[in-house]
Amino acid sequence: MQAYFVLSSVCSNFALMIYPSNFENKIQFSEIRSLLKGYCLSQLGKDKVDAMGFTDNAERINTALKQTREFRRMQEETDDFPLQFFFDMRESIKRIRIEGTHLEENEIFDLRRSLETVAGIVRFLNRSDDDGNFDYPTLHDLTEGVLTFPDLIRRIDQILDKYGKIKDTASPRLAEIRSQLRKAEGSVSRTLYSILHAAQSEGLVDKDVTPTLRDGRLVVPIAPAMKRRIKGMVHDESSTGKTVFVEPTEVVEANNRIRELEADRRREIIVILTEFTKLVRPHVDDIVNAYRMLAEVDFIRARAEFAQLTGGIEPEVSAKPVVDWITAKHPLLWLPPGKAGKTHPCSASAMSR
């Protein structure tokens, strides 16, 4: 029978003495870590790879092997396991423990999608047969104590659109501000085009010129020699000096109003983000716990992919000091052609004396 090394190292809560101290380097374990991290979907899994170490706890090793075995079986049996949106939101979530802080728009979007993944994984791993036997019992254990957050997801959907941007309807105040802003911008645009067309008719401005933005204000590009022909304020000039950007007097006040409305919009968005964050704050510990599950799933998936890559089989592990390897090979030597060197099979057998 041929046996292969298979990755079964798990994080240990105690320091296991390894001799020699550079044992990992000698067996090129850093390369295994690198390969594993390449299979991770997020920093969540990569941190687990970095943290893993050797252990002599047979129960932990066998649990890790069962997890890998079940994940490989799942990959063969189904393709609907949730693997999208493994976002690492741990630092963002921990940050909002402090009163007065708030999540940003993009953070809420990533939170929504990753919480959806958490809920999907919990649903998937809770599948069972008619007798109540879970399809993947060891993986199911990962969901114990993991909460899902349908109310938070629903609230996010009320705030953000499908692109992760704040909706007009996120609050009545925001809807009103954005409505006023659109009207003000439309009015400025119409006035500018009217001034521009008149200037083009008089030959002051080229026919292909259109209004542009400078420092958040709509302006008209014009040749320096003609700038006094249009009453207004010069805001900028091009790097070549051949164009200046004039804000006509007729739109200065309207542009000021636009800036005020933009400031109002930002303040209202901060109110919305702050109010939502208040809903999240009581659940910080439970959300962080959910991300621990995502990290474990990411790590297990990486192990399953590595086992597939190297053709690994599941070894038998007992708590007894027994080593019985038959034609064993280092897993790196089972990489596809071109990725590995010459194989050096070995056999070893040792029993406690």
Language-model region placement:
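Extended, Lys/Arg-enriched charged tracts that mediate electrostatic binding to polyanionic substrates
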Residues: 176-226
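Active-site phosphate-binding and catalytic loops of NTP-dependent enzymes
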Residues: 97-104, 126-131, 193-209, 302-313, ...
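Non-transmembrane, heptad-repeat alpha-helical coiled-coil rod segments
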Residues: 262-296
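Conserved amphipathic alpha-helical "coupling/scaffold" segments
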Residues: 6, 10-173, 177, 283-286, ...
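Extended, charged coiled-coil "arm/hinge" scaffolds of SMC/Rad50-like chromosome-maintenance ATPases
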Residues: 148-164, 253-274
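Gly/Lys-enriched N-terminal cap/neck module of very large, oligomeric protein machines
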Residues: 32, 207, 216, 220-237, ...
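Conserved NTPase motor "head" modules and their coupling/switch loops across ABC/AAA+ ATPases, GTPases
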Residues: 220-221, 289-353
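Low-complexity, intrinsically disordered or signal/transmembrane-proximal segments
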Residues: 2-4
